Regions:
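Membrane-embedded alpha-helical bundles of multi-pass transporters/translocases
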Residues: 2-223
């Protein structure tokens, strides 16, 4: 029994295809999150022309509310039973489509909204985004359970971090290129950038999650 465990920990489990598709999923997932992180405030100020007081209120609300919600969402994820597909993979597959939709809505505002109604809309979208990001972080956790081989796991985690960092910065290049084509319409630049990140993000995350396997099974025991 002991030799079987040792052999299992030394065997290479993650295939090249699985490894590459997982990293692609990570790259474009963080490309989605990076789009909001890099350009949401610019959209609010430069396109919607919200005031400094409105921007301050918005930033306060979207810092506090999602932070509180993240505790409950994290508790749900932690207490969630591991199914046949794993613990984290189903969550990543479930959340990517609504997350992409909210990404688009983060850079689109219905005409005619102003004042309190505009703020309610913006905060609602931002809170949804924060909640989906907490769920979507499951895609990062998958790297920890892809293989019982410690060296292989460290390698996956290392490349995941690199892919995530590069993907997070990718929207800066995407919007820059779009800006060379549509120079005089900043709002259009953002919505096109969000659309590209959303479309490719859905495809790559679903493709990666359909290929990746969670090979470490664990249970959370209550004492």
């Amino acid at each position: 029994m002991g030799s079987t465990v040792i052999q299992n920990q030394e065997t290479k489990h993650v295939k090249t295809k699985e490894f590459v598709l997982y990293l692609l999923g990570i790259f474009f997932y963080t490309c989605m999150t990076g789009m909001v992180g890099s350009y949401r405030n610019a959209y609010l100020v430069n396109v919607l022309k919200i005031t400094d007081d409105e921007a301050s209120l918005f930033n306060t609300l979207v810092s506090v509310i999602p932070f509180v919600l993240s505790f409950f969402i994290s508790m749900y994820i932690d207490g969630r039973k591991t199914g046949k597909s794993g613990k984290f993979k189903p969550l990543a597959m479930f959340v990517v489509v609504p997350m992409a939709a909210v990404l688009m809505l983060s850079f689109w505002t219905p005409k005619g909204l102003s004042g309190t109604f505009l703020m309610i809309y913006l905060v609602t979208i931002a809170v949804l985004w924060g909640a989906f990001c907490t769920l979507g972080n499951s895609i990062n956790m998958i790297a920890n359970v892809m293989t019982p081989n410690m060296k292989e796991r460290d390698n996956v985690i290392s490349f995941r971090s690199i892919s995530s960092a590069v993907g997070n910065s990718a929207p800066l290049v995407i919007v820059l290129v779009i800006g060379l084509i549509w120079k005089d319409n900043e709002g259009l630049q953002y919505i096109i950038g969000a659309g590209l990140c959303s479309a490719v993000g859905i495809i790559t995350v679903l493709l990666g999650m359909s290929t990746v396997k969670e090979r470490i099974t664990y249970t959370a025991e209550k004492k």
